[in-house]
Regions:
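Short aromatic-glycine-(Arg/Gly/Cys) micro-motifs in beta-strand/loop hairpins
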Residues: 2-22
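Short linear motifs centered on Gly/Pro in flexible linkers and helix caps
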Residues: 6, 33, 37, 41-44
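Assembly/interface hotspot detector across virion components, adhesins/toxins, and nucleic-acid enzymes
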Residues: 8-12, 25-27, 58, 63
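Residue-level detector of functional hotspots within protein domains
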Residues: 13, 29, 47-49
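Short linear/disordered segments characteristic of secreted peptide precursors
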Residues: 14-16, 28, 54
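A short, exposed loop/beta-hairpin motif centered on an aromatic-Gly-Thr core
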Residues: 19-38
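Short, mixed-charge low-complexity intrinsically disordered segments
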Residues: 41, 45-66
Length: 66
């Protein structure tokens, strides 16, 4: 069974409006809870790097396990 994560980004549009963008990512299953926590932490770091790389103006973002 795979691990599914829900990513929500509150993006700030050029006119000042805040729009929520959602995405689901499915990653391979882990054998332990510690592995799942590590996978979640790595995903949060990857999302942060992607937002900085693409210079997306955002108010906040959340990553949760579905």
């Amino acid at each position: 069974m795979n691990n599914t994560y829900l990513i929500e980004v509150d993006r700030i549009e050029p006119n000042g409006d805040v729009v929520t963008i959602t995405e689901r990512r499915t990653l391979c299953a882990t054998k332990s809870n510690k592995g799942r926590d590590r996978q979640l932490n790595n995903l949060v770091n990857r999302i942060d790097e992607e937002l900085k790389y693409y210079q997306v103006p955002y108010k906040r973002y959340t990553v949760s396990v579905v």
